[in-house]
Amino acid sequence: MDEAPRIAIDAMGGDGGPATIIAGAAQARDRDSSLRLTFTGDETVIRAEMARFPQLADSIVVHCDDVITGDDKPSQAIRRTKSSSMGAAILAVKAGEAAAALSAGNTGALMAIAKLSLRTMHGIDRPALAALMPTLGDNDLVMLDLGANTDCDARNLVEFAVMGAAYSRLALGIESPRVRLLNIGTEELKGTGELKEAAAMLRQQTGGAWRFDGFIEADRLGRGEADVIVSDGFSGNIALKSIEGTARFITDLLRRAFSSSLRSKAGFILSRPAFALLRHHLDPNNHNGAVFLGLNGLVVKSHGGADEKGIANAIAVAAKIAREDLTRRITDDLEDFRSHAVQTEGVA
């Protein structure tokens, strides 16, 4: 993409509302002055927030009367696609007026509106929600699905694997990502029928720019033993929330321990650099920006509780996948995988 991408941002979504979204967008613009931004939502509120940030003066504002809340069901959100700030951001992508859409709002509503408006790519049954997660290895990992689909069959999981590998190569620069399926054990006989069937299909893969390394258990997620971890959305969302909750627990536990006595406080001063590094790795704002894979258009989901830095990071994710044409990469990889699958069946 020669021209800097335009990102359509739902300014009304998220816990912090327009103040956090606009401030985060200003941070993103400070990092990358070539970014072009469109904000959707209450124009009066948005422009009042934009007035604090001269770097956003050339941004476009699309007025919307309606806001999708966390209490809205997907079916309700769909009916308000044209009138809502969330829907307007996605429709901008559909119309070619933006390269990607971003929202920190209701995940289920965002998924429903995006799928209905943009449709899934040819041959893809369901889109998946993918995000980067920190590890103890040299690179982060891509994990999907994180909640878009609670019930998946083997074909869905295989498609997730191919799409996740494409995203891993783009986001992390890994030439041949290691793909593994999240399971209750690493043995081939462990797991549901869908998992075992998906594993069998992935083992037959004879080409392509990734490799299947079998199953992985939840306690090994952050060990750097995989580049892409695939699961259904139910298990993936539980794993994600468990990781986030554990990170907050550890942070709070350390804070309490370091403030328990004068000796502990002195210890904190000495270990502050290490503690700062730990907080950096555990802070979800540093990995904010999950991507819906498998749609005919790019949509990024920000964590609802993200701060300004988190919003800026999510915008950076949207800009990167737009610049490097993630949709085309996924299409090419799916075609490559299917051609190898046909060749394998022919040999068999």
Curated annotation (Swiss-Prot):
GO annotation terms (biological process): fatty acid biosynthetic process; phospholipid biosynthetic process
Pathway the protein contributes to: Lipid metabolism; phospholipid metabolism
EC number: 2.3.1.274
GO cellular component, one term: cytoplasm
Gene3D superfamilies linked to this entry: Isopropylmalate Dehydrogenase (3.40.718.10)
Catalytic activity: a fatty acyl-[ACP] + phosphate = an acyl phosphate + holo-[ACP]
Family: Belongs to the PlsX family.
Protein's job: Catalyzes the reversible formation of acyl-phosphate (acyl-PO(4)) from acyl-[acyl-carrier-protein] (acyl-ACP). This enzyme utilizes acyl-ACP as fatty acyl donor, but not acyl-CoA.
Entry protein name: Phosphate acyltransferase
Species assigned in the record: Rhizorhabdus wittichii (strain DSM 6014 / CCUG 31198 / JCM 15750 / NBRC 105917 / EY 4224 / RW1)
Lineage, broadest ranks: Bacteria, Pseudomonadati, Pseudomonadota, Alphaproteobacteria, Sphingomonadales
